[in-house]
């Protein structure tokens, strides 16, 4: 059997394929920018730019709003990857954004983080639904994720960010991760909501503390900014499990925090709440 030589070394099943010292392995990068416009009574696509490992799909829908599905063709993120997404829901339009599958934060090298940056704007009289599926953290992952939403005073926004701590079905525990996560909502240019966390080290031990998460394997944040938010408080509380809570931080902003033992339990608890806050509809990607 012939052997191929590389830099003076034969390549066989025993050869090392580790990168040379100082080499920069290839990294995934993706960019999507999109905006909507009004066409008659319907919300339609106005502009779209996509490049690299980020793609956007637009399933056909009979509703008057525009649905967009984000796709990471790299299959996940790891240290050094960079993904940027921007979207603008123009005046009077409705835009629903989701992901084709769960995002996965894989084990990273010691130094670089995976970077995910999302920037959304909601114009006057518009509605934006930010409904990504779960982000799953793998042991050894390093993720820096930022979401900023800028709203006009009379805009409406529904947001969910579900986070899963390891693959429970495979017995994975997160004993070594790095996580930076920041969610910021601005209304009329002024800060209306800020949620930020940073962690490095043994997340499993931290989550097992009774006053932190009591061993939960997944969590979610839901924010509903709307003139109807106050009227949704009592009905939403009725739908929540014992490991979740809802409160009004402003008369027009409802915040829900939820813990669950597994990602399946989390989604099962989230779906009726999101349906309630989204006119009894959900993207088909969310179906169990």
Give the predicted meaning of each segment.
Residues 111-173:
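Internal, conserved structured core segments that host functional sites
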Residues 2-134, 139, 275:
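N-terminal, charged/glycine-rich beta-strand/loop interface patches
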Residues 32, 83, 116-118, 126, ...:
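One face of beta-strands
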Residues 28, 50, 114, 141, ...:
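A short, structural micro-pattern
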Residues 54-58, 106-111, 140-142, 168-172, ...:
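A short, polar/proline- and glycine-enriched secondary-structure boundary/capping micro-motif
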Residues 89-91, 99-101, 122-124, 132-134, ...:
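Short, structured patches in soluble enzyme cores that scaffold and shape functional sites
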Residues 163-288:
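A structural signal for small-residue-enriched, beta-sheet-centric alpha/beta enzyme cores
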Residues 94-96, 127-129, 156-158, 220-221, ...:
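Structural motif
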């Amino acid at each position: 059997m012939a052997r191929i030589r590389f830099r003076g070394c034969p390549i066989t099943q025993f050869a090392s394929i580790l990168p040379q010292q100082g080499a920069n392995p290839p990294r995934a990068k993706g960019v999507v920018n999109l905006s909507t416009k009004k066409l008659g009574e319907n919300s339609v696509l106005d502009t779209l730019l996509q490049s690299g490992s980020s793609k956007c799909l637009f399933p056909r829908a009979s509703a008057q709003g525009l649905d967009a599905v984000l796709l990471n063709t790299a299959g996940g993120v790891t240290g050094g990857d960079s993904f940027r997404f921007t979207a603008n829901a123009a005046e009077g339009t409705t835009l629903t954004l989701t992901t084709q599958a769960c995002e996965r934060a894989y084990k990273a090298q010691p130094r670089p983080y995976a970077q995910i940056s999302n920037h959304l704007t909601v114009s006057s009289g518009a509605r934006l639904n930010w409904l990504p599926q779960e982000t799953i953290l793998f042991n050894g992952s390093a993720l820096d994720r930022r979401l900023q939403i800028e709203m006009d005073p009379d805009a409406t926004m529904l947001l969910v960010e579900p986070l899963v701590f390891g693959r429970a079905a495979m017995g994975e525990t997160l004993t070594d991760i790095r996580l930076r996560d920041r969610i910021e909502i601005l209304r009329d240019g002024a800060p209306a909501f800020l949620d930020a966390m940073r962690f490095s080290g043994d997340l499993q031990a931290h989550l097992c503390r009774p006053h932190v998460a009591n061993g939960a394997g997944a969590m979610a944040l839901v924010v509903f900014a709307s003139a109807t938010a106050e009227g949704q408080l009592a009905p939403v509380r009725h739908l929540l499990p014992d490991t979740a809570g809802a409160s009004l931080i402003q008369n027009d902003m409802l915040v829900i925090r939820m813990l669950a033992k597994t990602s399946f339990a989390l989604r099962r608890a989230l779906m009726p709440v999101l349906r309630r806050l989204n006119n009894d509809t959900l993207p088909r990607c969310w179906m169990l």
